[in-house]
Amino acid sequence: MPDSRPDTELSNPQSAKAPLDPHLKALENESIHIFREVAAEFERPVMLYSIGKDSSVLLHLARKAFYPGRVPFPLLHVNTGWKFREMIAFRDETAKKYDLDLIEHINPRGAAENITPFTHGSAAFTDIMKTEGLRQALDAGQFDAAFGGARRDEEASRAKERIYSFRTPDHRWDPRNQRPELWNVYNGMIRKGESVRAFPLSNWTEVDIWRYIQAEDIPLVPLYYAKKRPFVERDGMMILAEDPRLELLPGEVRQEGMIRFRTLGDFPLTGAIRSQATTLEEVIAELEIATVSERQGRAIDRDQSGSMEKKKREGYF
C-alpha cells in the first residue's frame, strides 16, 4: 500500500547549485522593479498565491524586493476545496516559515451548494469556485492591485496581456482596451473602483522558471518531481488517485506508475505526465525537449466553451 502521508518538506531534491546567469538576473531585476512599482503606486496590493511553481518564484522575488523587511502585502489563496493535499500542507508551512499574512477564501455559495468538478463540470466549477471566489475576495479586501504569476508563454490569451492588466470595477478584462507600455514605464492611474492585475513574470518562460528555481534553491510542492503514484486514466489525462472523493467510473482501473505534474491545480482537473525526472536537472532536461505547453495538463483549458480568454474577461486569474 502506498504511503498516504503527504510529502511536504520545504526543500528540493539534491541539486548542484547553478549561478544566476545574466539572462536570469535581468528577468529577476525586472520582476523586482515591478513589485516595487506596484507597492509604491497602489494603496492596497495583494499577491495571488496558487501554491504552484510560479507562485513560489513570485514569492521568492517579493521577499527579495522588500528584504530585509517582511513582504508588505498579504497573500491571497482562493481555495476550491479540491487542491492536492500536498499543496495545502506546503502552503501552510511556507506561510509559517516566512511569516506571511495569508488570506484563504472559499466561495461560500459554492460550498453551500456543494459545487464540485464531478457534479457540475469543469467550466461551471471553475467559474463559481475560482472566478467568482476571486472577485469576492478582492472586493472584501478592497484590493486595488493584485500580483499574479501568469507568463506570456503559457497560453494565447496570456501572451497578449500587459504587465499592468487593467480591470473594470466588476473585475472584467477588455483585451482591446489596455494601455501601451513603453519600456519599463507603467501607468498605474485608475478610477475609483477599478483595479490592476500585475504580472512580474510576464517575460519568463517555463524553462526560465525552473532554471531560477535551481539557481536560487526555491522549495516546491513535491508533486513536481516524479514518484511512483496511483492514478486513473480519464478523458485523456492521468488523474492522481489518492483522494477518497475520486470514485472510479465504469471501466476505469487504478494504476501505479512514475508520474509528475508540470502544472498544479484542482486534482480532478489536473493531469500528470509519465516521467523519470526526480531532480531539478532531470526536470529541466525534460522540459528542454518538450513540444507541448504545460497547460495541456489542465482540463479547464480543453473546454472551448470555457476558454482561458473567456475566463479572463470575466475576472479569472
UniProtKB/Swiss-Prot annotation:
Chain positions covered by the region annotation Disordered: 1-21, 298-317
The pathway that the record names for this protein is: Sulfur metabolism; hydrogen sulfide biosynthesis; sulfite from sulfate: step 1/3
| Domain of life, source organism | Bacteria
Q: Does the keyword Nucleotidyltransferase apply?
A: yes
**Disulfide bridge map:** none
**Which GO molecular function entries does the Swiss-Prot or TrEMBL record give?**
ATP binding; sulfate adenylyltransferase (ATP) activity
Q: What is its EC number?
A: 2.7.7.4
Entries under NCBIfam families matching the protein: CysD, PRK05253.1, PRK12563.1
The entry describes its oligomerization and partners as: Heterodimer composed of CysD, the smaller subunit, and CysN.
The family assignment reads:
Belongs to the PAPS reductase family. CysD subfamily.
UniProt name for this protein:
Sulfate adenylyltransferase subunit 2
Q: Which organism is it from?
A: Rhizobium leguminosarum bv. trifolii (strain WSM2304)
Write the gene name: cysD
